[in-house]
């Protein structure tokens, strides 16, 4: 990925080109350190290439990487600060024990070359904070890591689930995800303080978007309503209480996820998609300092689904857990890819057929209340597990094929003592029953070893996330305080909203623009129709000093600029 382009014909956009691009647009590069190949010395060599002076100092020995950087056309150090140790490691065959044992070695080697670099540690993508991957990382590395890495992809929908999901459900899920994001960030930050005692350990959201992995009936990831969703995510991530250092939208340019689509080397014209315009508006209408803003709007209800909690009624705080009495025995399905037995309410599974088995054959169903948070915990022990990870999952008893939502905590491998494994799950508005599942997910190759699933407990927690505010936004001001900026999101899918804005101070309206489309599901993907989603000017009226009015279009993101008189 470095050196002359002629020596890397299959990697024309390598490290030098990436860094040059970041410098050109004023972005701070974030570089992921591979965990599946290489070693700490390789990571130190990378830091030398990026940050060491080209003066023959060669701080890591061996190849003079700073000299190679200079030969690549950049004599001065790039001074890269931000690095990730791995990417979504909880989804790989590597164990959390391997991860926490190697992180300090990489961090020490890299900082020996450039002490100012920051190396982030991967947290898992879940609300499993009582134990599991994130808890172990914080417990073992909490005093060492420079920041925590999270990827809060919500809502979630794949092509199979899309067959049983209406476009209306998708649209409502997209505009209802903000409360779940706040809830998840709060869990991470609370866990950091609880386990490490640190108040200086922040989060980096190095990927975010919806997880709409489908194309029919519409590629929801590229729609206007998903742009509203991502604008809403930005609103949350900007809040100081979120404790987020930086955030990276997934992704900039790519034919599937990209906010800009079209391959120029194939003669295609780059086209700005709906998500691109969100960042164009924030870039233009976000000042240097946030300003407090209160909003009042007509609420929107959502019954829950696609990984998003129900949004009905008045928001309430989380109650103390109440234990739900459930008989201790497990139910079992026929299992032919190994053997399983139950004694003293412990299910023992022997993966002795050397297959890539999808295990879900021991389970427990129980009654559940609608719109309620449940915490399900199971004692699990593993013996010589190779080729995968063991844990538990929870779902609505209607099952994956109908609900397509199964939160899981799957992280045990090798030989482990009895370990309490916990999953949190919030039921949808029409829930009647839940299912606890002993789990191993296929796809990691043949598995061998023994897993035991023992005593479990189920706790009920009352908490309502409340209805969706239909109009939300961010207020900010310029560094000198002479300009005031607003970014307003109208989540009303089909109706414009006449909006009155009251401002403390003597400001006059200067400019207003809005991201709109012909419908919430509009995209710019059609070859001859690349302006279905676009930014248009809006009329803003001053009624009297301190009060302006504007009509926010349906399904829109609007930027407003005001200047002090």
Describe the function of each predicted region:
Residues 1-160:
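N-terminal catalytic cores of secreted or lumenal carbohydrate-active enzymes
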Residues 493-506:
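Surface-exposed beta-strand/loop patches in extracellular or lumenal glycoproteins
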Residues 49-50, 95-234, 240, 299-302:
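Noncatalytic carbohydrate-binding groove/subsite architecture in carbohydrate-active enzymes
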Residues 204-309, 466-470:
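Aromatic/acidic polysaccharide-binding cleft in carbohydrate-active enzymes
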Residues 14-29, 109-116, 144, 187-200, ...:
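A structural motif corresponding to the C-terminal end of an alpha-helix
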């Amino acid at each position: 990925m470095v050196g002359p382009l002629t020596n890397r014909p299959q990697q024309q956009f390598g490290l030098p080109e990436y860094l040059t691009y970041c410098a050109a647009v004023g972005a701070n590069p974030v570089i992921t350190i591979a965990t599946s190949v290489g070693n700490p010395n390789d990571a130190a060599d990378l830091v030398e290439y990026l940050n060491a002076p080209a003066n023959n100092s060669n701080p890591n020995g061996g190849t003079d990487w700073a000299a190679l950087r200079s030969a690549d056309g950049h004599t001065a150090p790039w001074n890269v600060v931000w690095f990730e140790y791995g990417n979504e490691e909880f989804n790989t065959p590597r164990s959390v024990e391997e991860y926490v044992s190697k992180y300090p070695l990489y961090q020490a080697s890299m900082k020996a070359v450039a002490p100012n670099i920051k190396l982030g540690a991967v947290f898992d993508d879940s609300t499993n904070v009582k134990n599991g991957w994130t808890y172990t990382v914080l417990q073992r590395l909490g005093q060492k890591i420079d920041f925590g890495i999270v990827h809060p992809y919500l809502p979630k929908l794949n092509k199979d689930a899309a067959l049983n999901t209406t476009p209306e459900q998708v649209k409502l899920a997209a505009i209802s995800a903000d409360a779940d994001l706040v809830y998840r960030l709060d869990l991470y930050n609370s866990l950091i303080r609880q386990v490490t005692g640190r108040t200086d350990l922040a989060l980096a959201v190095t990927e975010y978007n919806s997880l709409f992995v489908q194309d029919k009936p519409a590629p929801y990831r590229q729609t206007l309503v998903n742009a509203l969703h991502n604008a809403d995510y930005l609103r949350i991530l900007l809040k100081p209480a979120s404790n987020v250092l930086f955030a990276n939208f997934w992704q900039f340019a790519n034919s599937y996820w990209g906010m800009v689509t079209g391959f120029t080397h194939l003669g295609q014209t780059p086209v700005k998609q709906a998500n691109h315009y969100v960042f164009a508006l924030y870039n233009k209408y976000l000042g240097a300092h946030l300003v407090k803003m209160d909003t009042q709007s007509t609420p929107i209800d959502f019954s829950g689904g696609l990984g998003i909690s129900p949004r009905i009624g008045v928001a309430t705080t989380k109650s103390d857990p109440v234990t739900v009495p459930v008989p201790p025995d497990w139910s079992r399905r026929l299992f032919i890819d190994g053997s399983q037995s139950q004694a003293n309410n412990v299910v023992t599974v022997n993966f002795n057929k050397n297959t890539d088995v999808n295990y879900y054959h021991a389970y427990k169903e129980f009654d559940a209340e609608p719109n309620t948070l449940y915490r399900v915990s199971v004692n699990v022990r593993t013996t010589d597990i190779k080729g995968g990870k063991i844990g538990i999952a929870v779902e609505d008893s209607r099952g994956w094929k109908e609900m397509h939502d199964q939160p899981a905590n799957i992280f045990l491998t090798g030989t482990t003592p009895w370990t309490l494994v916990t999953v949190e799950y919030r039921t949808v508005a029409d829930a009647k029953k839940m299912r606890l599942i002993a789990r191993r997910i296929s796809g990691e190759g043949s598995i061998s070893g023994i897993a035991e699933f023992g005593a479990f407990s189920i706790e009920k927690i009352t908490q309502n996330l409340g209805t969706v505010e239909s109009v939300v936004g961010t207020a900010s001001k310029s560094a000198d305080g002479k300009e005031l900026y607003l970014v307003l999101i109208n989540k009303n899918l089909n109706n414009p909203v006449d909006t009155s804005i009251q401002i403390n101070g003597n400001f006059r309206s200067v400019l207003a623009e809005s991201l709109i489309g012909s419908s919430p599901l509009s995209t710019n993907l059609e070859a001859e129709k690349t302006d279905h989603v676009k930014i248009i000017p809006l009329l803003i009226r001053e009624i009297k000093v301190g009060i302006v009015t504007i009509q926010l279009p349906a399904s829109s993101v609007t930027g407003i600029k005001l200047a002090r008189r």
